[in-house]
Each structure stands twice: as C-alpha cells, then as structure tokens.
C-alpha cells in the first residue's frame, strides 16, 4: 500500500511542484504579472503548438487515435456540460449561470491534464493527450461561447465569430496541420524537429509556473459558497461519474487513466478570460480556478491511487 502511494506521488508531484513553484516565485517577486502575461502568450502561441504538433507527428496514429476513447470523451463532455448547466439553473442567480457552467465543465486539459498524462504514460500519454486536446479546444470554446452568450449581451455568439475563434487558435492549427502529415509520414529535416523539441520541452514547466503565478490567494479568501459548490461539481462529482462510466464501458489501462485525468482536471484559466470578455462575474471565475487547482492536488492523487489499487490502470 505504501509503495503504491509513493508511486502515485511520483506521478503527480512533479506537476504540482512546478505549479506551486509559480506561486512561490510570484510571492518572492521573482516573477510578476507582466512575466505571466508574456510567458503565457509564448506558451499559447509557440510552445504548446510545437508540443501538440510533435506529439501527433511522432505518434503511431493507429494506436494513438482511439475512436472509442474519443467518442466516450465527447459524450462525457456533453453530459458534463448539460449537468453543469442544469446545476447552474438550480443553484445560482441567472447572471452567474454562464460562469458557473463554464467553471464546472471546462478543464485545464491542455496543460495540467496533458502534463499528468505525460508523467503517467510518457510519449503515448502525449500522443493520445494531444489528439484529445485538439478535440477539447473545439468543444470547450464552442460550448463556453454558447452558454456565456445566453447570459451576457456583450459576447458575440454568432456561428461566424465562434468558428473564427476556433480555427484561428494556434493549438487547433497545430493539430490540423500535424494530423495529415503524420498519416502521410511527411519527412521533416532533423534540424527543424530538434528546434521544435526545444520549444516543446519548455511548454509544460513554463505553463505550470505561469498558472501558479496567476493563482490569487485573495480570490480564494473572497470565494463564497457558490465557488465551492462549482468546484465540488468539477473536481468530485463529474470525475466520479465520468470515470465510473468509462470503467463500466470497459476502458482499462492507459485509456481509463487518461480519461480520468482529463475529466478530473481543474478549471481552465481561459475561463477567466472568457468571463471578462463577457462582462461576467470574473471574481467568481477566478475563485473557481484557484479552488479547483488546489483541490486537484488531492483528488488526482486519490483517483490515481484507487485506480492503481484496483488494477484498472
């Protein structure tokens, strides 16, 4: 039992250590908000696209593209979205329903989920995680735009605006470019692949430090019952339902592990940006991000420990 616990911590500790290093570096003023802003732009526009591109380009797509996993993840995301929206209608004021829904279903899969998948399953985790990440970006941006627009008159929600935001996303572009090149086994020069590797290796440490640097303890202190309610839905109920459903559908090993990590990842930082753009309750959005990220350090370890103890991953 102790050996299994240590094995679980060896998987998750490097990820959360980098995240809390960001908190510490911000606290001792080695990084500031300007660093986080610029570094986040570098990650989003350059490093993360390189990581996703190479993850797919080097992948054996016959093994990385799992139609059953993809279909289940799509269904789980849509069900999670519907449950979150239903809970929002039941539990919170109309003005905050879009923020509640987005906070409860939109996970930080592109950074924390992918980092944990890579830590647990190595290159295969990155390959399958990259495929799911491309899908996640499409779904999260579309569904978030819809639910926020319903409760905000300031956010554009016409199909053209949604499609433009999705297909101008560097992460989507990298996935769309890499997939046919991987299938066609298009050769690239070694110097270009090596340079891309340098950028890709920067991605997860830098992104995790940035997330840590943007966590606001003031937002945590100011969080109320509503933020805690959303966080419990995101970090306990949806992962429990989603992972149990995956287990009942027969998923085991890496597939079940990655589904758990993606469904159980904390709320994405992008939810705060979209809340501001919609003139919504961005303080609530910030509180949800902080609480779910802190909860993830506990729930992820418990989930992996139970799945490994049962011999399911």
Regions found by a protein language model. Give the residues of each.
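Alpha-helical transmembrane segments of multi-pass small-molecule/ion transporters
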Residues: 1-313
